[in-house]
Amino acid sequence: MTNKLTSLRKLTTVVADTGDIAAMKLYQPQDATTNPSLILNAAQIPEYRKLIDEAIEWARSQSDSREQQIVDACDKLAVNIGLEILKLIPGRISTEVDARLSYDTEACIVKARRLIKLYNEAGISNDRILIKLASTWQGIRAAEQLEKEGINCNLTLLFSFAQARACAEAGVYLISPFVGRIMDWYKANTDKKEFAPAEDPGVISVTEIYNYYKEHGYNTVVMGASFRNIGEILELAGCDRLTISPALLKELSEAQGEVEHKLSFNGEVKSRPAPITEAEFYWQHNADPMAVDKLSDGIRKFAVDQEKLEKMIADLL
């Protein structure tokens, strides 16, 4: 009998949500995603020490300014970890722009170009990289410009339908709607403490976005993210991609049985509405308290981990 991970791969592209090279070797995903929190965790792994040392040495050669060296070393470390992961996967690595830039379109564009340049200088072409940006209005506008330059983007921290719609209309390559963090909010802010997978508000959100994209002929890839259990994952089988932590990949690989195909679209494509305006985006996003809370919370948490990473680098400089 097949295991559920093998069965899921027949329906959905499986992506590893980790910076851990050992996990890549074990689960052999198509793609991998990283973020500041995962880079910080990966930096604690002894085998990665040489990647940190190399990033610091390189940063020292780029600038005499200590502050700039810290920024450069963090960028180079994220790319160094990405390069190691790319040796083990056939597809793409997602590398994230500093979350503190999430409300500055031009700064996001500049940072994205810098990360791409570092990958290119290491011999990696753009078609193996996704630049991760927070799904703020400014992040989406940055992605719109980057896509025109041939830099594909992964729009993350996506919690509202307004964010999803704006991303599709901007022509971004991929979105990462969060599942588990949506459920976390409903558990914390409502009387309901348990959700069956089909009733999980995060699952319902991704299903709605997936159906809308397919019904309107958008090419933007839907990659469900931030899972709390395999029930959520199995309920989204058939989604374009799912990015899954090593712990849940392990659980899927140990569970026996075929996975039922849940998401698919065979209907007629409808005409698209006029693009959402900035005012409409903020009004509709603001109407969803969960999305407002989780977007700002996610940006703050990634920013905190970026600052921890910078402190770790500063202590080694």
Swiss-Prot record:
Its EC number is 2.2.1.2. Pathway: Carbohydrate degradation; pentose phosphate pathway; D-glyceraldehyde 3-phosphate and beta-D-fructose 6-phosphate from D-ribose 5-phosphate and D-xylulose 5-phosphate (non-oxidative stage): step 2/3. It is an enzyme of class 2 (transferase). The active site is at K132 (schiff-base intermediate with substrate). InterPro entries: Aldolase_TIM, TAL/FSA, Transaldolase_1, Transaldolase_AS. GO terms for biological process: carbohydrate metabolic process; pentose-phosphate shunt. The keyword Cytoplasm applies. It comes from the Bacteria. It is found in: Cytoplasm. Keywords: Cytoplasm, Pentose shunt, Schiff base, Transferase. The keyword Ligase does not apply. HAMAP family: Transaldolase_1 (MF_00492). Belongs to the transaldolase family. Type 1 subfamily. Homodimer. This is Transaldolase. It comes from Proteus mirabilis (strain HI4320).
